[in-house]
């Protein structure tokens, strides 16, 4: 007991708290005091040491709590050592395994010395790894287990749990002592005495029970403390001694293991020195040979020139340089500081691509802002490491990234994208070629993704797979693609459709196979229940299935019973150019490079030789499949010719590209002693010679483009009439002078536009003129019955009611017909954009005026004469609007635009690209021919009237059409006309002031839908000098001209804005009523709903007016004229 007291005393003396509390009791003193009290309670002084006992327990509790915290940290560290050691052991085992495999490769390549060395090092690593595993096991048993037992046993809990029974005994003692003391004092007071204190001897007998309980709990507490001290001290150190011995054994055994290789290592070092000398000598000779060849071919000058160009391409001019690892494209979110008074940070979706930064708005209906990085400068913020500024030509954008790493990524991507765009600009014409290749590759990928089954993973069915197996032509998800990579490139070669820059050669199989077709073969015999994984399956299930499917071909359809039958099927697949049949025999395990027994061919010719010999631009996918899956590209025929020799012999450069992509041996010679390059030079196959030279010098680019009949779909062009009818919202006219091309539509992909022969640049588009239209770019005839009006266009101004005849039977009226010739009512729609409209990304697809398919002859060229003009109607579909004006006005309902299927119009452009689109090149006779049109009869028999409640007036000649502003020079026959065009058959040249006042619209809005003729038939108005010039508005001639379009189908059917008129005289308040909903795209535009009234305050141009909502002057801005109609004053 004395030794226990001394241990406790030494343990406690190191604690500062103990040193600050001198009134404590040691274990030996407690034992002596308690024994004395037990033998003689009345003479004992134990009661005076009660407070010392309590102080001692408090001090011990503090020390135990500190030890508990320290031991928990020790345990955490030891566990970290154990876990990292286990990882280290696993990594060492993996290292030994791959090193052994690597050494085996050397052994198989007749290089035994190096192979044996690698295998021995692999064995050494395995043995050391085993020793380390034993050491970690000792650490777990001796240290971790001991600490776990102590912390989860005696030291379990929190501070104070251990001394709770002691505290209760102390409290009971205090309570009883206070009670007795009070009674003694009361008793003395009753006898007239005053008690100052009560000694322990007086109450020893009365307090004996409580004192014994206190002494018992004190003993229990000290016993537990003693046990804990033993476990955390002696026991733990004994286990650390055991771990020490384990460490000694580990190092001694490891040294013995390493000593076994000592002599071999010394011998190996000498051998390696000799091998290195041999290799250095070879390298020296090769270098000398290379320098000799380079000097003879004068390649030094070319390389220096190329280097200078590349240095120029990396133009910096003190610009910020980004980390190239981040690339030049990125999507994500940035915080952008607003420009308002509050300057708040707003989270915005941003993307960088092709030198353009796109910043989305908070609302999806607003078009994102696009900044050309070539005109911007990226400037990091010195004060905030996560912020940077983007300085454009007209404002500064303040951005903040989520963290510093994201900040570095955005800065690098912005800088790299700008540098890439600058490099592309410096490269000039070369960039256009690369851009067209990128467009083609993008179009092929889009076509691949549309193939049946390619919307889900080929193996597990996950949606939207983006990983391509280039040698199988299938799409997989990212999880399954990882297993494909593990199987090796001889089974499946995985590339990303989004992350990798693919060449068209890598898309040949993907374009021709597809997941459904592939699985019809490879999964034809799936058992039930199906082992095929699902998108939620784990990697083990996926790996088992994919290995069985692609390595073992376990689920494929079996059609051949013998090897000869398989070879026959292989031959037939090549001869019939059936890729799926080729995949079928591949799935059955045919040896693709076995010689084929085909009479009339070179002896020993394989399927690859035959495919190369018979290849053209439609069968490259067969060659590609054989090249990527045969395994031996150097197989020779009886005459020693490889597939490379065949490419040179038969001049097959596209096949050669596919072969060189898989890196065959290019210097194989045939029986004549010629390589493929020699044959190409002898036969002067220049392309093959260049490709083989590049491969021989190591400069061949595997991501190569091949010439192939891709047969890309152009579904975007086949837009039906019904599709267009479902788009009731009109198209706003963009305020820009750039005209719209007849073949441009937002639904046409860039590659489709490039493939159109009639595709022209924006500069060419601006040269479109009316003279080009007379060349009959788009012509359609119809003999269908007359049609009834359909409210598609915005309502037009009323005309005086006179009944007019329908058009000639051979013409197609300017109204929408169904395919059967019957008419239906449709939603009203605004006209297509005017010539000044600039297409933006926010615009919906152009509603090209559609009509029924051609049913008659389609004349082409310039052979327009009076006879054909009177009976065959020229229609110019998909072109910008034109106006035909006249002073004779007849009351018409809403003008109905004819509809021609977009695919018809666009296909006709293929034969119209040779026609002149320049007004200057069109002779005046064209206009004169077009103007010789027969006059329509004024009154038909009642039975011939169509249900259309429209009235016709004499047709104006085409020569009187107004010129398109800024495009057409004045013609000789139009030069002496006033700014406002007039009809040729009216009295000579009435002036602008002679026009009647603005027509009233409201009274005729509903008439076209009723099918009734106007109740008041009036003759056409004559021009009178009664109207004041101030009554005119730019809308009047435009709408009047739109009315006349229904009269003459030979006229271009879409109106052109007239030259801007300057209003003179007193200003008058104009009010218009909206007939469509309009959502503003720009800050200065006006948003309104159908039926609201706008007060016009000004004009920005002919197609855009300025105004505010009536009664709400704060809602103001510009609005398109085609979205409103004018109210009467």
Swiss-Prot record:
GO terms for cellular component: Golgi membrane; podosome; trans-Golgi network membrane. This is Arf-GAP with SH3 domain, ANK repeat and PH domain-containing protein 1. Ubiquitous. Residues 938-972 have a biased composition (Pro residues). It holds the Pfam family Ank_2. Keywords: ANK repeat, Cilium biogenesis/degradation, Cytoplasm, Golgi apparatus, GTPase activation, Membrane, Metal-binding, Phosphoprotein, Repeat, SH3 domain, Zinc, Zinc-finger. Activity stimulated by phosphatidylinositol 4,5-bisphosphate (PIP2). Residues 442-565 form the Arf-GAP domain. A zinc finger (C4-type) spans 457-480. Phosphorylated on tyrosine residues by SRC. It comes from Bos taurus (Bovine). Possesses phosphatidylinositol 4,5-bisphosphate-dependent GTPase-activating protein activity for ARF1 (ADP ribosylation factor 1) and ARF5 and a lesser activity towards ARF6. May coordinate membrane trafficking with cell growth or actin cytoskeleton remodeling by binding to both SRC and PIP2. May function as a signal transduction protein involved in the differentiation of fibroblasts into adipocytes and possibly other cell types.
């Amino acid at each position: 007991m004395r030794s226990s007291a001394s241990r406790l005393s030494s343990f406690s003396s190191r604690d500062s708290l103990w040193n600050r509390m001198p009134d404590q009791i040691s274990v030996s003193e407690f034992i002596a005091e308690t024994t004395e009290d037990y033998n003689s309670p009345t003479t004992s002084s134990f009661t005076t040491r009660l407070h010392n006992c309590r102080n001692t327990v408090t001090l011990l509790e503090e020390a135990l709590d500190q030890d508990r915290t320290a031991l928990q940290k020790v345990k955490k560290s030891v566990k970290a050592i154990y876990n990292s050691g286990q990882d280290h052991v696993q990594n060492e085992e993996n290292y030994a395994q791959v090193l052994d495999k690597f050494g085996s490769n050397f052994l198989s390549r007749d290089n035994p010395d190096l192979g044996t060395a690698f295998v021995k090092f692999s064995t050494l690593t395995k043995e050391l790894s085993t020793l380390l595993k034993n050491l970690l096991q000792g650490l777990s048993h001796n240290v971790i287990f001991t600490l776990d037992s102590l912390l989860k046993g005696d030291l379990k809990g929190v501070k104070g749990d251990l001394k709770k029974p002691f505290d209760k005994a102390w409290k009971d003692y205090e309570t009883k002592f206070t009670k007795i003391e009070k009674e003694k004092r009361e008793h003395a007071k009753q006898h007239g005495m005053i008690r100052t204190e009560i000694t322990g001897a007086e109450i020893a007998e009365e307090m004996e029970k409580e004192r014994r309980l206190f002494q018992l709990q004190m003993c229990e507490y000290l016993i537990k403390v003693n046990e804990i001290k033993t476990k955390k001290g002696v026991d733990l150190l004994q286990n650390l001694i055991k771990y020490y011995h384990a460490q000694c054994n580990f190092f001694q055994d490891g040294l013995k293991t390493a000593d076994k290789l000592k002599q071999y290592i010394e011998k190996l070092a000498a051998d390696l020195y000799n091998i290195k000398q041999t290799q250095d000598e070879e390298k020296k000779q090769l270098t000398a040979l290379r320098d000799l060849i380079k000097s003879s071919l004068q390649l030094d000058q070319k390389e220096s020139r190329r280097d200078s160009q590349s240095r120029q391409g990396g133009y910096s001019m003190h610009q910020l340089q980004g980390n190239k690892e981040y690339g030049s494209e990125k999507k994500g979110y940035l915080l952008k500081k607003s420009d308002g008074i509050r300057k708040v940070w707003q989270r915005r979706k941003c993307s960088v691509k092709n030198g353009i930064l796109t910043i989305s708005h908070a609302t999806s209906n607003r078009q994102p802002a696009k900044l050309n990085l070539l005109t911007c400068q990226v400037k990091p913020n010195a004060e905030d490491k996560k912020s940077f500024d983007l300085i454009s030509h007209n404002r500064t954008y303040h951005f903040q990234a989520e963290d510093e790493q994201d900040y570095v990524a955005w800065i690098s991507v912005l800088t790299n994208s700008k540098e890439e765009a600058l490099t592309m600009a410096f490269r000039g014409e070369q960039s256009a070629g690369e851009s067209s290749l990128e467009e083609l590759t993008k179009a092929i990928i889009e076509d691949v993704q549309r193939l049946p089954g390619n919307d889900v993973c080929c193996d597990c069915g996950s949606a939207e797979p983006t990983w391509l197996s280039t040698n199988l032509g299938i799409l997989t998800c990212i999880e399954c693609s990882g297993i494909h990579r593990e199987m090796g490139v001889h089974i499946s070669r995985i590339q990303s459709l989004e992350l990798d820059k693919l060449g068209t050669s890598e898309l040949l199989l993907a374009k021709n196979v597809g997941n459904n077709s592939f699985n019809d073969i490879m999964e034809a015999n799936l058992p039930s229940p199906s082992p095929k994984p699902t998108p939620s399956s784990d990697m083990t299930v996926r790996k088992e299935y994919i290995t069985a499917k692609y390595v073992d071909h376990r689920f494929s359809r079996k059609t051949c019973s013998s090897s000869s039958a398989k070879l026959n099927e292989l031959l037939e697949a090549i001869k019939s150019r059936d890729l799926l049949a080729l995949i079928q025999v591949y799935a059955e395990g045919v040896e693709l490079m076995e010689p084929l027994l085909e009479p009339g061919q070179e002896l020993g010719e394989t399927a690859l030789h035959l495919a190369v010999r018979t290849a053209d631009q439609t069968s490259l996918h067969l060659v590609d499949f054989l090249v990527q899956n045969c395994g031996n590209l150097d197989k020779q025929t009886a005459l020693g010719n490889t597939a490379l020799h065949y490419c040179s012999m038969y001049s097959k450069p596209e096949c050669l590209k596919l072969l060189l992509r898989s890196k065959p041996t290019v210097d194989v010679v045939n029986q004549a002693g010629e390589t493929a390059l020699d044959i190409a030079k002898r036969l002067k196959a220049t392309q093959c010679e260049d490709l083989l030279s590049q491969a021989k010098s190591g400069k061949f680019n595997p991501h190569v483009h091949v010439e192939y009949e891709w047969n890309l779909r152009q579904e975007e062009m086949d837009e039906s009439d019904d599709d267009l009818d479902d788009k009731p919202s009109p198209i706003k006219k963009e305020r820009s002078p750039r005209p719209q091309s007849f073949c441009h539509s937002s639904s046409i992909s860039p590659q489709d536009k490039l493939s159109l022969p009639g595709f022209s640049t924006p500069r060419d588009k601006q040269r479109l003129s009316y003279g080009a239209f007379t060349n009959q770019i788009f012509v359609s005839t119809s003999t269908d019955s007359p049609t009834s009006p359909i409210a598609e266009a915005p309502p037009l101004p009323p005309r005086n009611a006179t009944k007019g005849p329908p058009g000639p039977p051979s013409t197609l009226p300017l109204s929408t017909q169904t395919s059967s010739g019957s008419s239906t009512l449709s939603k009203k729609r605004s006209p297509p954009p005017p010539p000044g409209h600039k297409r933006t990304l926010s615009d919906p697809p152009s509603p090209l005026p559609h009509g029924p398919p051609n049913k008659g002859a389609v004349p082409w060229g310039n052979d327009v004469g009076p006879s054909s003009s009177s009976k065959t109607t020229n229609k110019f579909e998909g072109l910008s609007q034109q106006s035909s004006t006249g002073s004779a006005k007849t009351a018409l309902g809403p003008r109905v635009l004819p509809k021609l299927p977009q695919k018809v119009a666009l296909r006709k452009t293929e034969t119209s690209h040779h026609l002149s689109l320049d007004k200057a090149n069109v002779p005046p006779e064209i206009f004169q021919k077009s103007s010789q049109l027969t006059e329509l009869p004024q009154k038909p028999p009642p039975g011939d009237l169509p249900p259309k409640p429209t009235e016709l007036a004499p047709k104006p000649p085409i020569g009187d059409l107004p010129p398109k502003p800024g495009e057409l020079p004045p013609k000789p026959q139009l030069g002496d006309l006033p700014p406002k065009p007039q009809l040729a058959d009216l009295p000579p040249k009435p002036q602008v002031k002679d026009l009647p006042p603005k027509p009233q619209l409201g009274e005729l809005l509903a008439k076209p839908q009723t099918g009734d003729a106007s109740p008041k038939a009036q003759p056409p108005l004559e021009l009178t000098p009664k109207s004041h010039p101030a009554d005119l508005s730019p809308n009047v001639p435009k709408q009047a001209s739109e009315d006349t379009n229904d009269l003459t189908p030979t006229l271009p059917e879409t109106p052109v804005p007239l030259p801007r008129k300057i209003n003179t005289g007193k200003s008058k308040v104009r009010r218009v009523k909206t007939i469509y909903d309009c959502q503003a795209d720009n800050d200065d535009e006006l948003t309104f709903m159908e039926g609201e009234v706008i007060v016009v305050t000004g004009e920005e141009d002919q197609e855009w007016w300025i105004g505010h909502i009536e009664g709400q002057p704060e809602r103001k801005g510009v609005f398109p004229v085609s979205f409103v109609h004018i109210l009467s004053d």
